[in-house]
Amino acid sequence: MAEITAALVKELRERTGQGMMECKKALVAAGGDIEKAIDDMRASGAIKAAKKAGNIAAEGSIAVRVEGGRGVIIEVNSQTDFLALQDDFKAFVKESIDEAFEKNLTEAAPLIASRESAREALVAKCGENVNIRRLTAVSGETVGAYLHGHRIGVLVVLKGGNDELAKHVAMHVAASNPAVVSPDQVSEELVAKEKEIFLQLNAEKIAGKPENIVENMVKGRIAKFLAEASLVEQAFIMDPEVKVGDLVKKAGAEVVSFVRYEVGEGIEKAETDFAAEVAAQVAASKQ
């Protein structure tokens, strides 16, 4: 068996990114053969990645890329926000968004498959579950993007206008989180639900009032709801005296669509019982 030197351990550590003790153990198990040690570590890394796959990943990063009338946005999840700020994770996210854009992908599945080996390697190195969650691609006359830190990303498609206007609208979407572009896109189901909520919350106030008065109150609330939910009806964050729709119209443009991603939205996060977790770790250490 070849001698396990400090230089050999260092080389393996540099090539795999694993800890010193893990590298030394791998070299001993491989009889000092560094290439075999790397293969063995990759295999165990895949096993580790499979084990980590059951852990909830609700943190992470949003990435966007826009060029030549095309835009792509992706969400990549991690278990902690700490990992999302690390260089290895950032590199994985950048490589993923670049591949998605350059291959002109329109859904996440092909990207997930293509990036699986890189994902497994990252999981093995960082010890956290990592997932590419979703991807949306858009195209149009004018496509703008805005990234707020690493947690909120927006793509906006305009008919007409320019890049600056599209970016400003994207910034507004990031801050105001509209549900739809215009009031006519709000579903009847959502309107009915809002009406029901209004009647429940104001049951005492409307009790005994004439039906036509109640109906007018409901209409007023629904009109306000539609304005709040619709991008073009919202007051522009950079100039509240102007509606977004009027701002865009004045520039001879029209909002076609938008996509807004926020890290972890819709993912149910696990409630961590730290006392139980510590107790479990102590019990495991005694075995």
Swiss-Prot record:
One of its GO terms (cellular component) is cytoplasm. GO terms for molecular function: translation elongation factor activity. InterPro entries: EF-Ts_dimer_sf (IPR036402), Transl_elong_EFTs/EF1B (IPR001816), Transl_elong_EFTs/EF1B_dimer (IPR014039), Transl_elong_Ts_CS (IPR018101), UBA-like_sf (IPR009060). Pfam families: EF_TS. SUPFAM superfamilies: Elongation factor Ts (EF-Ts), dimerisation domain, UBA-like. Keywords: Cytoplasm, Elongation factor, Protein biosynthesis. It is found in: Cytoplasm. Disulfide bonds: none annotated. Residues 80-83 are annotated as: Involved in Mg(2+) ion dislocation from EF-Tu. The keyword Cytoplasm applies. Associates with the EF-Tu.GDP complex and induces the exchange of GDP to GTP. It remains bound to the aminoacyl-tRNA.EF-Tu.GTP complex up to the GTP hydrolysis stage on the ribosome. Belongs to the EF-Ts family. PANTHER family: ELONGATION FACTOR TS, ELONGATION FACTOR TS, MITOCHONDRIAL. This is Elongation factor Ts. It comes from Ectopseudomonas mendocina (strain ymp).
